[in-house]
């Protein structure tokens, strides 16, 4: 059984000036207990594809997929899954306060206002005893 199954994944970045298709209809799967790698040229969409599956792309990216399933269950991007970045410096930006980084993620995932995202970020930090 595949742990992760992704079918017909498309990612398009939208702006007022242009529309850029970063990922065009890719399929991939990861089998439980196996190491899976996605390889390709620089700029071919490897990181964009994984960030799309995890729900970590910003609000300017349109993500569509025929299927994203985790252990056979259809999931919304980012639910019940995590990603470990190869470069640990990409996990958190040391030049940006943690509250802002959390708020940006909340805003992108929940499609809410900046004020709502900031409030949620503060609630999350309070819940684990981190001063903001």
What are these regions (language model features)?
Residues 39-41:
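The feature captures the beta-strand-to-loop junction immediately N-terminal to the Walker
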Residues 3, 12-25, 56-62, 95, ...:
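A short, flexible loop at the N-terminus of ABC-type nucleotide-binding domains that lies
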Residues 63-77:
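Conserved ABC transporter NBD signature motif
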Residues 87, 94-108, 120:
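Q-loop/switch helix immediately C-terminal to the Walker
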Residues 5, 27-29, 69:
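ABC ATPase nucleotide-binding domain
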Residues 37, 79-86, 100:
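ABC nucleotide-binding domain signature
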Residues 116-132:
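Conserved ABC ATPase "signature" region
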Residues 36, 47-60:
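Short, conserved post-Walker A segment of ABC-type ATPase nucleotide-binding domains
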């Amino acid at each position: 059984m595949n742990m992760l199954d992704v079918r017909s994944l498309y990612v398009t970045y939208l702006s007022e000036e242009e529309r850029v298709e970063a990922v065009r209809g890719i399929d991939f799967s990861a089998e439980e207990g196996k190491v899976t790698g996605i390889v390709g040229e620089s700029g071919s969409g490897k990181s964009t594809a994984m960030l799309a599956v995890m729900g970590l792309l910003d609000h300017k990216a349109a993500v569509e997929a025929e299927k994203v399933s985790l252990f056979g269950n259809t999931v919304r991007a980012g639910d019940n899954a995590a990603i470990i970045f190869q470069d640990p410096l990409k996990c958190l930006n040391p030049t940006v306060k943690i509250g802002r980084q959390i708020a940006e993620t909340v805003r992108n995932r929940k499609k809410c206002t900046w004020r709502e995202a900031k409030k949620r970020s503060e609630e999350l930090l309070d819940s684990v005893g981190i001063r903001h």
